[in-house]
Amino acid sequence: MSAKIKSGDDIIVLTGKDKKKIGKVIKVIIRNAKKKVVVSGVNVCKRHTKPRAGSGGGIFNKELAIDVSNVAILDPKYKTPTKVGFKIIDGRKVRFAKVSGEVID
């Protein structure tokens, strides 16, 4: 089964406090039929950690997951939000941007 959003994709946030921010997908989480993505520089919170053996404590920034419905892939040609389609080229199933028709991978 092919996924519409994969790690390493450039995306834009459509809704929420980080609306219109652009980032790269770090991780895709699929749990209990809910899909979420972790995006670099988006939905950042501060985590306070205690010192442990081998590492000091402190306050660190951490990216939290966002629901897949709140993000869209950036079109490689026009840099606008786009939907993703699938087509078969030379016997391989590839993703393409519906706005420009460019192949994503």
UniProtKB/Swiss-Prot annotation:
Which UniProt key words apply to this protein? Ribonucleoprotein, Ribosomal protein, RNA-binding, rRNA-binding
Q: Which superkingdom heads the taxonomic lineage of this protein's source?
A: Bacteria
What's one GO MF term for it?
rRNA binding
One GO term under biological process is: translation
- Fetch the Pfam families from UniProt: ribosomal_L24
PROSITE patterns in alphabetical order: RIBOSOMAL_L24
GO CC annotation terms, alphabetical: ribonucleoprotein complex; ribosome
Concerning PANTHER family, the annotation shows: MITOCHONDRIAL RIBOSOMAL PROTEIN L24 (PTHR12903)
Assembly, per entry? Part of the 50S ribosomal subunit.
Its annotated function is as follows: One of two assembly initiator proteins, it binds directly to the 5'-end of the 23S rRNA, where it nucleates assembly of the 50S subunit.
Its family? Belongs to the universal ribosomal protein uL24 family.
By what name is this protein known? Large ribosomal subunit protein uL24
